[in-house]
Amino acid sequence: SRNFLPNMKQVRHALAEKLGAFPDDLVCVSNATEGLNIIAHSMRLNAGDEILTSDHEYGALEKTWDAVGKRTNARIVKVEVPVPLTSAVEFCDIIKTGMSDRTKVLFLSHVTSPTSLVFPLKEVIAEARSRGIITIVDGAHAPGLIDLDLNDLNADFYSGNCHKWMMSPKGAAFLWARQDVQPMLEPLVVSHGWVAQLGGS
């Protein structure tokens, strides 16, 4: 349809306003699992590198990271997060116990699928950034359920669904990336709209 690209631009601008983001930092994907697979398979990992996560993650994404680990010989490190959480400080301290000089990626849910916890991510993202660790957030259940300001949260990558609490049709989701890490992304499918100098768009 000749209206497809203008409509997609309109969607990105409306979504950016709702999510506290810039339109150029957002792309539309079919669901958060697809967006997170794009991110995960774009990570340049080596043997011995570590991917840090929690024991509250969505099963499909656990399989995604297992596949990445198998392909790259990176190691998955999973920390146990107690229920209930008492504070953001406690959460950050727990996640820090899993960090080492080999940790390259931190992958956490914003709202967990199996346990419905809202992880207080801002402090742990800042801690990871100070250590040079890439932060990736599974936001499948967050948009529309909690207030989001992606620029303020300041993760490296975030993917969320719009068909849950935002009441959009299935097939409506987004991938967000901070501008300086966007060249890391490699699309799973290359077609119209790919921009070579960015490595994808």
Regions found by a protein language model. Give the residues of each.
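Pyridoxal 5′-phosphate
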Residues: 1-201
